[in-house]
Amino acid sequence: MSAIVDIIGREIIDSRGNPTVECDVLLESGVMGRASVPSGASTGSREAIELRDGDKNRYFGKGVLKACENINTEISEAIMGLDANEQAFLDRTLIDLDGTDNKARLGANATLAVSMAVAKAAAEESGLPLYRYFGGSGAMQMPVPMMNVINGGAHANNNLDLQEFMIIPVGAPSFREAIRYGAEVFHTLKKIINDKGLPTSVGDEGGFAPSVENHEAAIKMILQAIEQAGYEPGTQIALGLDCAASEFYKDGKYHLAGEGMSLSSADFTNLLGTWCDKYPIISIEDGMAENDWDGWATLTNALGKKVQLVGDDLFVTNTKILREGIQKNVANSILIKINQIGTLTETFAAIEMAKRAGYTAVISHRSGETEDSTIADIAVGTNSLQIKTGSMSRSDRMAKYNQLLRIEEDLGDIASYPGRNAFYNLK
């Protein structure tokens, strides 16, 4: 019997030194599942609510004791004795118990920690690796990593408005080799930055955060690193951007302070299109602000056939919003962040909806992470084909990459690395 007999919520510390929630779930058999939740810096306004204590005298208001208390009291009472194998029923119980549209009462950080811990306990008891528990025998596709090697925006203290500049090893023959490609480019880029007399300190997600002349200078620096590392830009390693455009969208304009520009949606689309013509960029995340749906339509019409356009702040892993985007033909991909919605069942529903509509689903970390590697198992278990989990530094990022390396080893000969085929939305 997989009955839940004990639940413990506790406050731990994330990769930015801020409190976050960890949960242990104990089953009648003696098996335990443990999970901890991430936290974002640039967040969509329609994300599920992360419950913080608000006590300015403790962690500057960022404590999560209330969320932990909710786990240890109300949530515990509601799910004690339930079967851990009934994930959908358990998650529905959490959703109904909270009673709000955005987990504002109990906190998405509380519900997600419980949802994940239950799944991990159930997988452990069944004797299955977590990815296999999620995906059954069909889970065999490794994800293409999108590695954030230069940080800007809310993730760094430099003059870059765009938040992430990523390398994507589309030409690698396996996930293991994709990691090697990325690591070698990362170390080459570090030397290039150092040789320019710029600091090689890293941002929240493990990428470098140099102050360079402008955004194109950052792109050219990455291309130089790719070539010096012995790879061919475009064919072996492509580029991706996360604009996080909501962060610099004000009064109907996109204000690129580092460029000295203030652009309309159409002009910003043209700028992005110019970059895509000049450089091997195959993915742009949040290229328009979350509330600028007309701008998203313009961007999708202009670039949607040749560039993956990922909605993060736009869709916030929410099926209601994603459905609207699909109906309006806005974007062609969704970023999946488990803490944006607050349960595994709702996360899997968003992935499934995207796939059925021909959209890709990119599994993603947050800028504030822990050693929890559940998203690696989600990526393989759901055959999502793409993952975004940082650069080639910081152990909170390596935890996910290393788990994926273990999964690929476990899969053996049936492991498949899709490479450029991961971008099936561009065919």
From Swiss-Prot:
Task performed by this protein? Catalyzes the reversible conversion of 2-phosphoglycerate (2-PG) into phosphoenolpyruvate (PEP). It is essential for the degradation of carbohydrates via glycolysis.
Q: Write down the EC number.
A: 4.2.1.11
Compartments, as annotated in UniProt: Cytoplasm; Secreted; Cell surface
User: GO terms for biological process?
Assistant: glycolytic process
PANTHER family hit by this protein: ENOLASE
Family, as annotated: Belongs to the enolase family.
Protein name from the UniProt record: Enolase
Against CDD domains, the record matches this protein to: enolase (cd03313)
Question: What domain of life is recorded for the organism?
Answer: Bacteria
Query: Reaction catalysed by this chain?
Result: (2R)-2-phosphoglycerate = phosphoenolpyruvate + H2O
InterPro entries given in the database record: Enolase, Enolase-like_C_sf, Enolase-like_N, Enolase_C, Enolase_CS, Enolase_N
Cofactor mode of binding and number, as noted:
Binds a second Mg(2+) ion via substrate during catalysis.
Q: Which SMART domains match?
A: Enolase_C, Enolase_N
Tell me one GO molecular function of this protein. Answer: magnesium ion binding
Key words of the record: Cytoplasm, Glycolysis, Lyase, Magnesium, Metal-binding, Secreted
Residues that, per the record, bind Mg(2+): 242, 285, 312
